[in-house]
Amino acid sequence: MNKLYKKIVCFTLGFGLMVALCGCGSNTPKVQSEGMKSVGSLNVEEAAIYTDDSEKEDVIETYSSADGLCVIERYPTYYDVSLDYGKGEPVEVGKAYAQTILEAVPDFADTFEPYLHENIRGAFNGRKINYDALEERIETLINSLPEDYRDEVISFAKTLSQGEANYAEDGHAEDDYAEDCHVEYGHTEYGHAEDGYAEDGRLSYIEALTMQIIPDALRPTACSALSLGGEKTVSGKRITIRNLEWNTGSNNQMTNIHAVTHMKKGENSITTVGILGLLDIITAVNDDGVMIAILDVGSKEELPFVYNDKKCYTFEIRYALEHFDNAKEAGEYLVGESGDFTWCNNLLCTDEKDAFCCENATKEVAATGKARSVLRTTESELMEGLAWDSPDALCIVNSFATKGNQDGFTGAEFNITRFVKYNKWVKEKDKFSIADAKGLVAREVVDQFVVSNVHNSGNVHTVIVDYATGKIHVAFTKGDHADDIPVFWEVGTY
């Protein structure tokens, strides 16, 4: 294959990224490319050919809970899940979801449990794992969830682990249990909690709770997003693109359980793109077109992890999608809650009219004076040395970008490179169609590690929301890594 090498440094110089030294978190941080190497960008040999339409897969098999609260359709590439909160209480939906998963995917535990433990080991970064401390962390965070979410998650975990988690005859958690969500080893009334964290081929109760809050308790990896306003699109309506990069497991097991989940309550609904069994939000859009997706940022201060009096931001996103019909109010809500989150993060937040990035700093990081929470817009002034040349487009990577905020670009070539590439690609084209948007993630060879790509080996899914039609297009990674030219599927409309 002919591989065209384009120097990253050329991109950097061309778009004015400063290399002068600058202290992290100063009032006017300057982006610098300290430590960058002149390496090539390996492009695909031939340009991808896409259309605005995406094919639809055919259903292989359908599974339903006895009460009809959960329906799972198995497609060749993903699972389509419908959860009906209009016909049942959250605790009943949680139970129905777990029961249907056990029927549809009998080896679900064999798939998810090893992945969960890989994330746990990654969170402890080689240190000896204190499982008692981890259990306390999980219990505390689960207890912080709003009551409906907490009951749903507990019911799901109780059913999936096939234990008896101190439930009343009506299926609701007992008040004392719901209040402190306490699990004690050796007490069989708490289901399989006595097994605790053990890689034994089944998901214990505490493991089934932990899987619901991996981003909040253990932390994700990298992502990027781009939202093109009407002035940059052929249709005159917004197009939003989201790349999720995450650990898919040592055997890429998560690529076998992609899921599109429809959370319905009457006329209202949320469509999430994530992993089968998860009730939090990774990437989602509600029926009003409010789209929110998570991107990790973290802190440069090496502060201790705090979980007491904290909130799970992935469930706060779900709350925002359920209660707000526009991106501005949803974004303002999430920025307002961000001091109580467990990690600093960026949140893509768009609707047909607007695009925002919630630059969310925890109160501990904000107290250092190095970061602050702010709702970034296309008009926000960027930190010194960071160039963006398309006024009607918003780009997000794994760093804050607003002037005066924590600088996660300096010394982070991955962030610099992706931001510069997005800037170049958006600038060089007048208006984008959906086909063009798909083509943005099909420009570079994926299976390489010497350069930083927009569409790279860590990609789990790419979601494109077309505000002209309401269609949701998704490319799911299957196997070792994403395809150089991914296939997009239409998974429904919002």
Can you name each region flagged by the protein language model?
Residues L13, P29, E189, T378-E379:
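N-terminal compositionally biased, intrinsically disordered segments and leader/signal-like regions
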